Amino acid sequence: MGKSKKQKEEMLAGIKQNLSESQLALVINYQGLSVAEITDLRRRLIPTGSICSIAKNTLMGIAVKEDSNWQPMEDLLAGSNAFLFLKNDIGGAIKAYQDFQKATKKTEFKGGVMEGRLLDKDQVKAIADLPSKEELLAQVAGAINNIATKLAISLDAVPTQLATGINEVPASVNRAIKAISDKEQQGDAA
């Protein structure tokens, strides 16, 4: 028995909600996966804040047609598709899918869409290899901390060098007076 119009409208609203919250959407062919395997994929995606959803291509087509950021996905809507909505940890979600794909060897990656662009397998893999947001923040914080440490060491050295210079002035004046005095004595003796 088919779904009622109201059920389809609710599913469409859910798809649109997932798209609006996602940074990247992947399309995979899930033909041959068991319910347990799809559940396993969904569990792997949970820690990354991502979702695996199975929807009819016609419903997904309606959802993406209304949003220019997702329109390129229309080219991928054929066959038995599962949709991965990647929201927070994109790299972690892609790696979770890749690990799942290696374990099952049953899914086929069809493509992805990000910021209105259709992405192939290599482009998605390149995104997965980027550091996570937390790693980037840690790198920036480390760089700022390193600069602050070097600045503190440099500023600490300035008073020391200034004190050495101030102490050297009287000694230099003393040497200059002595040299002048010695020169005058040599001039008197001659």
Swiss-Prot record:
Similarity field: Belongs to the universal ribosomal protein uL10 family.
PROSITE patterns, sorted: RIBOSOMAL_L10
Xref: Pfam families: Ribosomal_L10
Name this protein carries in UniProt: Large ribosomal subunit protein uL10
GO terms assigned for molecular function: large ribosomal subunit rRNA binding; structural constituent of ribosome
Biological role: Forms part of the ribosomal stalk, playing a central role in the interaction of the ribosome with GTP-bound translation factors.
Tagged with keyword rRNA-binding: yes
Cellular component GO terms, alphabetical: large ribosomal subunit
Alphabetized SUPFAM superfamilies for the sequence: Ribosomal protein L10-like
Subunit: Part of the ribosomal stalk of the 50S ribosomal subunit. The N-terminus interacts with L11 and the large rRNA to form the base of the stalk. The C-terminus forms an elongated spine to which L12 dimers bind in a sequential fashion forming a multimeric L10(L12)X complex.
InterPro entries tied to this protein: Ribosomal_uL10, Ribosomal_uL10-like_sf, Ribosomal_uL10_bac, Ribosomal_uL10_bac_type, Ribosomal_uL10_CS_bac
Chain's gene name: rplJ
GO biological process, one term: translation
Superkingdom of origin: Bacteria
Assigned keywords, A-Z: Ribonucleoprotein, Ribosomal protein, RNA-binding, rRNA-binding
